[in-house]
């Protein structure tokens, strides 16, 4: 229980020191800038929950003075708005990187470890290395700089919100291509999430090559298949 109270206390401390003259979602970055960190990164992912397709991690690096007022958590924006902001973000930020981890590695590692793997790959791909990194309720091993881990960071950090938009737009494009490669599952619409129509397609067609075998109901499908093969 003490750990939970410590986290609440830390978040409360951050909130108390916010500058009302700054945009709310730039407060954390500005605290880091004020502490001497000149290159601050935010990371976010898309695709942890779906039963099909990859998990995509994005990292965005910013310097003081970089800001786009319209940027928000990607889930709060329309597809059209995300795509518009995508172009603005990649043209304005100091550096950015995206890593894609497919279903096979997700099944091998588990989704949590696969997500961390994607973040590490994105971090390693950056041309400009950040001095501080903000993530949503996650910490990475091997990063020597300052790390800030906060729940719902995509709602209160500009850099993380930028990363959430990049990850979401790129993953959506991947799923739209998969909709053409594997028709019948509705990937363009459901993006791999288990909607009623998606479940019905699974019952009719069986899993596709991009379905995650470690996720239900696909896991049970392959379990039943093994039992059938033994009979």
UniProtKB/Swiss-Prot annotation:
It is found in: Cytoplasm. SUPFAM superfamilies: Ribonuclease H-like. Residues 38-227 form the RNase H type-2 domain. Its main location: cytoplasm. Its EC number is 3.1.26.4. Manganese or magnesium. Binds 1 divalent metal ion per monomer in the absence of substrate. May bind a second metal ion after substrate binding. Pfam families: RNase_HII (PF01351). Belongs to the RNase HII family. Endonuclease that specifically degrades the RNA of RNA-DNA hybrids. This is Ribonuclease HII. It comes from Carboxydothermus hydrogenoformans (strain ATCC BAA-161 / DSM 6008 / Z-2901). The gene is rnhB.
């Amino acid at each position: 229980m003490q750990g939970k109270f410590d986290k609440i206390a830390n978040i409360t401390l951050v909130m108390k020191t916010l500058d009302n003259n700054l945009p709310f979602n730039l407060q954390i970055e500005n605290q880091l800038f004020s502490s001497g960190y000149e290159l601050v990164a935010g990371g976010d992912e898309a695709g942890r929950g779906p039963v099909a397709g990859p998990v995509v991690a994005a990292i965005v690096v910013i310097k003081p003075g970089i800001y786009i007022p319209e940027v928000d958590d990607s889930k709060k924006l329309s597809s059209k708005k995300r795509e518009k902001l995508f172009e603005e973000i990649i043209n304005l930020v100091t550096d950015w990187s995206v890593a894609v981890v497919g279903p096979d590695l997700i099944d091998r590692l588990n989704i949590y470890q696969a997500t961390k793997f994607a973040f590490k790959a994105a971090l390693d791909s950056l041309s400009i290395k950040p001095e501080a990194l903000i993530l949503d309720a996650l910490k990475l091993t091997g990063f020597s700089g300052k790390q800030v881990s906060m729940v719902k960071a995509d709602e209160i950090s500009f850099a993380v919100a930028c990363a959430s938009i990049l990850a979401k737009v790129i993953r959506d494009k991947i799923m739209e291509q998969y909709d053409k490669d594997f028709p019948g599952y509705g990937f363009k619409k459901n993006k791999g999430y288990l909607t009623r129509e998606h479940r019905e397609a699974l019952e009719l067609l069986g899993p596709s090559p991009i379905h995650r075998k470690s996720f239900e109901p696909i896991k049970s499908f392959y379990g039943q298949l093994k039992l059938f093969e033994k009979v």
